């Protein structure tokens, strides 16, 4: 299971967020009913591991270790090796701090307007690449039947792709997919 740590990048006056950096880390275990988390026979989200919803890991420059330990250890199905999770989270925070430092260096060297212009250029370029790839997709429908659920009910994934070649856009429709998937 992956955990994503997101940090704001503030302007030089610490008044306005100018960017965000993120670090997504794969954690070997986040609790749940089985080691490694995410068992295939889960019937609710808590069986898959500790549910972390918008938790502030760092406050005023201080890692909130006590509080995150409580979250990880006091869940219905807690993590099995909290010290490993803590070390991984600290590494993710360090990665975000490095990203913030590098962005700060770019802004100091080139100025915020140039850096934002390049970020917008990357976004626009990515959109062009994706739209060109979409224009090559053929309309299609798929239905995949899976093994029955633990209660014996049918499980399937249904997908249809409707491509607008002119707009280079696609609508992905999952109608007909089993609700809990």
What kind of region is each of these model predictions?
Residues 1, 7, 36-43, 80-83, ...:
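Alpha-helix capping and helix-loop boundary segments enriched in small/acidic/polar residues
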Residues 1-4, 22, 30-36, 153-157:
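Short acidic, glycine/serine/threonine-rich loops at helix termini
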Residues 4-12, 22, 162-163:
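A short, hydrophobic, proline-anchored segment that marks a local hinge/packing element in signaling
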Residues 8, 17-21, 169-171:
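Structural motif
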Residues 12, 26-28, 55-60, 147-149, ...:
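Generic structural motif
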Residues 16-78, 181:
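Gly/Pro-rich active-site capping loops and adjacent beta-alpha segments
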Residues 51-130:
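N-terminal leader/propeptide and maturation segments of large enzyme subunits in energy/redox metabolism
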Residues 97-179:
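Accessory "access/gating" subregions that flank catalytic or transport cores
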């Amino acid at each position: 299971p992956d955990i994503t740590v997101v940090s704001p990048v503030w302007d030089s006056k610490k008044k306005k967020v100018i960017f965000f950096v993120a670090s997504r880390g794969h954690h070997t275990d986040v609790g749940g009913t089985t080691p490694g988390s995410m068992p295939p026979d889960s019937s609710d989200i808590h069986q898959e591991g500790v549910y972390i919803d918008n938790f502030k890991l760092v406050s005023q420059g201080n890692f909130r270790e006590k509080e995150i330990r409580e979250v990880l250890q006091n869940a219905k199905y807690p993590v099995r090796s909290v010290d490993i999770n803590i070390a991984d989270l600290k590494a993710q925070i360090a990665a975000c701090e490095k990203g913030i430092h590098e962005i700060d260096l770019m802004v100091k060297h080139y100025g915020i307007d140039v850096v934002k212009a390049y970020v917008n250029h990357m976004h626009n370029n990515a959109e062009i690449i994706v739209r060109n790839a979409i224009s090559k997709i053929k309309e299609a429908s798929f239905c995949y039947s899976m093994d029955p659920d633990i209660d014996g009910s049918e499980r399937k994934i249904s997908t249809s792709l409707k491509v607008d070649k002119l707009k280079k856009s696609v609508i992905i429709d999952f109608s007909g997919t089993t609700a809990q998937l």
